[in-house]
Design a protein with these regions (language model features):
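Helix-breaking motifs and short loop linkers at transmembrane-helix boundaries and internal kinks
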Residues: 30, 62, 83-88, 272-273
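Cytoplasmic helix-loop-helix junction between adjacent transmembrane helices
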Residues: 93-129
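C-terminal transmembrane helical hairpin of 12-TM major facilitator-type secondary transporters
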Residues: 250-296
Length: 363
């Protein structure tokens, strides 16, 4: 259980650490903010590609082995990023890191499941993963100011090494022993995946660009990091809370409330009003996006008890695809007169539109 929480929490730092440092990295590499968005895209290309192989590998060989491979990839990739060898090598390094972050999410959650964790503990795992991303948004900007542009990378490598300790101590966990039937075309899983995309996926897109949005509105890097970090960081509270509520509130109602709340929070950010209004928007978006995590993944595992790891992977892959496509597109919005606000208006609309697949999802 501890190993799963460590793997999920430490390696999801990589999801938002670059977005938190977007402006300094743009200056260092001599590229636009939209190009910096490609560093996140490079990560999520491999993060997406490894989802199903990691899930099937966890089902067949055990989640501990997959987790250790993920940790090794994160360390190697961030070591490459620490080299000052240009933007092209940075893209390669982020792609290697993506193998680690993608496999880590699946393996970490499956470690919790294999250890006997139900909806409440899986919600706690979700909170741990949000902690990593949220803390990166809050800590990396001032740490970069105090040190250098390398801050996102050396911190990520150190956290990956930290996650290795409890993972190496895991023993005796049950595993499925086979990869299960192929889940890619499972029509019952896809609506569940759409809900994960509309909550976690869009929240990560928003979290990656909230800091530069607020900086362009006049906030300091520290204030923007603290406010923008709320989008991911407050999931520490609502993901476990959603797990506790899973047995007390109808899953469909819980997810509907989350979608409406996320849409409202993104809309507040899109308005470009006073800093306090944008901060409230970040808070509301983060609280809402974290709420349905346990409901969504518990439903995925119930749908495919023959391949729980692969089911986790497919549902999360839907969110990763959203991040992969949405992050660079959101970056392009910063080249428009709206200074990025248009991206958050679209996020608000997409969150609300997910009420449609909610009707088809078996929760």
């Amino acid at each position: 259980m501890v190993a799963g929480l460590a793997v999920g929490g430490c390696l999801t730092w990589n999801v938002s650490n670059v977005g938190a440092d977007a402006n300094p990295l743009s200056e260092h590499y001599g590229v636009s903010l939209a190009a910096i968005g490609l560093l996140t895209t490079a990560l999520f290309v491999t993060h997406l590609a490894v989802q199903l192989p990691a899930g099937r590998g966890a089902d067949r060989f055990g989640s501990q082995r997959v987790a250790l491979i993920a940790i090794a990839a994160a360390v190697v990739g961030n070591a490459v990023l620490l080299l000052d060898a240009g933007f092209e090598l940075a893209l390669l390094g982020r792609a290697v890191v993506g193998i680690g972050s993608g496999a880590a999410f699946v393996a970490g959650l499956d470690l919790v499941r294999a250890g006997g964790g139900g909806a409440a503990l899986q919600g706690l795992y979700g909170g741990a993963t949000m902690t990593g991303g949220g803390l990166a948004l809050m800590i990396v900007p001032p740490l970069t100011d105090a040190t250098s542009w390398r801050a996102p990378y050396w911190t990520a490598a150190a956290l990956a090494v930290l996650a290795a300790a409890p993972t190496l101590l895991v023993s005796g966990l049950p595993r499925i022993g086979h990869a299960g039937a192929w889940v890619l075309r499972d029509r019952e899983l896809l609506p569940i995946g759409a809900l994960q995309a509309a909550t976690f996926g869009l929240a990560v897109v928003a979290g990656n660009w909230a800091v530069p949005l607020l900086e362009r509105q006049g906030a300091s890097s520290t204030a923007a990091g603290l406010a923008g970090g709320l989008i991911l960081f407050v999931g520490i509270v609502t993901r476990p809370a959603g797990g506790l509520l899973a047995g007390r509130v109808r899953g469909r109602l819980l997810v509907a409330a989350a979608l409406i709340g996320a849409s409202f929070g993104a809309l507040l950010l899109a308005l470009g009003g006073p800093f306090i209004v944008s901060t409230i928007g970040s808070l509301v978006l983060g609280l809402a996006a974290g709420l349905p995590f346990a409901v969504i993944f518990a439903a995925a595992q119930r749908t495919r008890p023959d391949a729980p790891g692969a089911a986790i992977a497919l549902v999360n892959a839907c969110a990763v695809l959203t991040i992969l496509v949405g992050t660079p597109l959101a970056g392009l919005a910063f080249e428009l007169p709206s200074d990025g606000r248009l991206a958050f208006a679209i996020i608000a609309a997409l969150s609300a539109s997910a009420l449609v697949p909610l009707r088809a999802a078996r929760l």
